[in-house]
């Protein structure tokens, strides 16, 4: 081995770590980190000092955030279930999604927004359930108020979403605020859009009091909607995401195509076009669609033509147990038999290239 290279060789893994592009939100890996709060705070790679401080100071909040990761990743996978990129996660990768989010694409915009929303949702819910020392129900919702139906009393436990938003902003945005590059600004914008999305679906719920439920007196509280509403809303924002470029002074965005409107704080923004995700690509972090189940009768993104990228599909027949011949019995039960059902399953063919199965 060449002498100068021999001196560098022991340091090569560290040098590669420094030079490799990085996905900012390493806190996503908190889902996979068990043990005490100290173990979690010290072993999640990539946290900046502010995030570690908050982690050590608020271990109960970190547990809520860690549990919330599973919820928002499941929501991401639900929204992308019929698409070539299906929000698949990598258990052994501290970025959770691998290299696919290194590209400043619409998919990256959605993941940053849904993850930020997930933190708000998880913290706010934990507050209302009395699981956090630093917060409880919304202290501002007290006394009497009015709405279109008349006067009511604040009661019950209103979700303290403002606390959830403040903590999420401090923790999630900490790493991006240390950077001044375009990607950091993109992430901050989409993080904020995600937080705002949760608050958008805060709803007033009421209980009537009076003779025979006459509603002479109402007690009301504010509650977050099911997280699916936030996911559906951000999915619509993903489909309408706006491609942007940095402005000349590097402090904000301008639309890449002048025919499109300027993005609002609720919109998702991105810089780069997405890959087609058709084949496994180590550099792009794309797992490809070989082996994915497709829908032969669909004309949408889950159709065999679109999902398989024109490569064709294989068909296999499987059997599964289903309920059949169900009958209503008085009173009051439905009884069914177990039947075997045969059905065809269509899966995308692999590319003809010999290296398609190379691990990412």
UniProtKB/Swiss-Prot annotation:
Keyword Nucleus: no
GO terms for cellular component: cytoplasm; extracellular space
Listed CDD domains: Wnt_Wnt2
UniProt KW keywords: Developmental protein, Disulfide bond, Extracellular matrix, Glycoprotein, Lipoprotein, Secreted, Signal, Wnt signaling pathway
Glycosylation: residue positions: 295
GO terms for biological process, alphabetical: atrial cardiac muscle tissue morphogenesis; canonical Wnt signaling pathway; cardiac epithelial to mesenchymal transition; cardiac muscle cell proliferation; cell fate commitment; cell proliferation in midbrain; cell-cell signaling; cellular response to transforming growth factor beta stimulus
Family annotation (Gene3D superfamilies): 3.30.2460.20
Origin: domain of life: Eukaryota
Recorded family membership: Belongs to the Wnt family.
The name this protein goes by in its record: Protein Wnt-2
Species of provenance: Loxodonta africana
Native organism taxonomy: Eukaryota, Metazoa, Chordata, Craniata, Vertebrata
